[in-house]
From Swiss-Prot:
Residue spans binding DNA: 273-332
Identification of the protein by name: POU domain, class 3, transcription factor 4-B
GO annotation, biological process: brain development; regulation of transcription by RNA polymerase II
SUPFAM superfamilies (alphabetical): Homeodomain-like, lambda repressor-like DNA-binding domains
Stored InterPro entries: HD, Homeobox_CS, Homeodomain-like_sf, Lambda_DNA-bd_dom_sf, POU, POU_dom, POU_domain_TF, TF_POU_3
GO-annotated molecular function: DNA-binding transcription factor activity, RNA polymerase II-specific; RNA polymerase II cis-regulatory region sequence-specific DNA binding
Location of the protein in the cell: Nucleus
Basic residues: compositionally biased ranges: 97-106
Task of the protein: Transcriptional activator. Induces neural-specific gene expression to act as a key regulator of neural differentiation.
Domain named POU-specific: residues: 181-255
Keywords: Activator, Developmental protein, DNA-binding, Homeobox, Nucleus, Transcription, Transcription regulation
Lineage, uppermost ranks: Eukaryota, Metazoa, Chordata, Craniata, Vertebrata
Length: 356
């Protein structure tokens, strides 16, 4: 009694709370929220595939519980179910969706499913677990181990993945086309390089002539080094394959022009045609040597008459005398009389040969 008298507010507060709670309960028992009533009655009629819906679907409405604001909290965002395309993509790669096969620890909270059931445009409720190929346990409807038929796989893919698949098919087709192209082997390139070198030398063309001729004929100028490396098989396989058809065309044209002066002149004009080395017989060379000892610098008339007698070109005779004089200078030390001077003193020289 003393305790009650010392604290008169305790009795008042406890009694008032009891009466307040009882009043609320008495008011809440006959009255139900219209929205709550309709949704609860409606949810009871929805088939749930053998899994009855818990009471938290009804009691977690925004007007039934002040804690319904947690529906927009980060905890609720972690339990957002994946879309149709994500679930179907997971079925294709043989992975079970973690949101379907494992329950989140927050599912026991009464406010986890605070939002109302999702409805489509026709007004029918959409079951989250009724995705094609999935059940509530995350297994596949058609057996649980094999993927869906391949006919629907491409259509169910994401547009980006579907486009990537199409590009992959096109890429494989292009690779198949490139593989069909005729590519010479290393043995064929080696044989062609050997044959090309033999034919080029036989026709009398230098490597530089071939490079310039390719530039004039086909618009691709190649240096002498490139042709040399091709013949020596020192280029890469890719460059050898590129250069082979050009050299083959040039070789065919050069072979077809054999015996035709006009074609030969045309090819010679395209490149620097190397002059053939003049070979003089030993008997002819002896006659020229004897004439050189008599007159190292013959006149133009003497060169012409000597060329006619030896059946040589005038230019060949003139060049031979020039080269012979240069050789005489290299062989004779400075200050010593040259050989033609010694010979001129011992033998009477021809008066028509004069020093110029």
């Amino acid at each position: 009694m003393a305790t009650a008298a010392s604290n008169p507010y305790s009795i008042l507060s406890s009694s008032s709370l009891v009466h307040a709670d009882s009043a609320v309960m008495q008011q809440g028992s006959p009255f139900r929220n219209p929205q709550k009533l309709l949704q609860s009655d409606y949810l009871q009629g929805i088939p749930s595939n053998g899994h009855p819906l818990g009471h938290h679907w009804v009691t977690s409405l925004s007007d039934a519980n002040p804690w319904s604001s947690l529906a927009s909290s980060p905890l609720d965002q972690q339990d957002i179910k994946p879309g149709r395309e994500d679930l179907q993509l997971g079925a294709i790669i043989h992975h079970r969706s973690p949101h379907v096969s494992h329950h989140s620890p927050h599912n026991n909270h009464p406010n986890t499913w605070g939002a109302s059931p999702v409805h489509n445009s026709s007004g029918q409720p959409i079951n989250v677990y009724s995705q094609p190929g999935f059940t509530v346990s995350g297994m596949l409807d058609h057996g649980g181990l094999t993927p869906p038929p391949p006919s629907g796989t491409t259509q169910s893919l994401h547009p980006v993945l579907r486009e990537a698949t199409d590009h992959g098919d096109l890429g494989s087709h292009h690779c198949h086309d490139h593989s069909d192209e005729e590519t010479p082997t290393s043995d064929e390139l080696e044989q062609f390089a050997k044959l090309f070198k033999q034919r080029r030398i036989k026709l009398g063309f230098t490597q530089a002539d071939v490079g310039l001729a390719l530039g004039t004929l086909y618009g691709n100028v190649f240096s002498q080094t490139t042709i040399c490396r091709f013949e020596a098989l020192q280029l890469s396989f890719k460059n050898m394959c590129k250069l082979k058809p050009l050299l083959n065309k040039w070789l065919e044209e050069a072979d077809s022009s054999t015996g035709s002066p006009t074609s030969i002149d045309k090819i010679a004009a395209q490149g620097r045609k190397r002059k053939k080395r003049t070979s003089i017989e030993v008997s002819v060379k002896g006659v020229l040597e004897t004439h050189f000892l008599k007159c190292p610098k013959p006149a133009a008339l003497e060169i012409s008459s000597l060329a006619d007698s030896l059946q040589l070109e005038k230019e060949v005779v003139r060049v031979w005398f020039c080269n012979r004089r240069q050789k005489e200078k290299r062989m004779t030390p400075p200050g010593d009389p040259q050989q033609h001077e010694i010979y001129s003193h011992s033998v009477k020289t021809d008066t028509s040969c004069n020093e110029l």
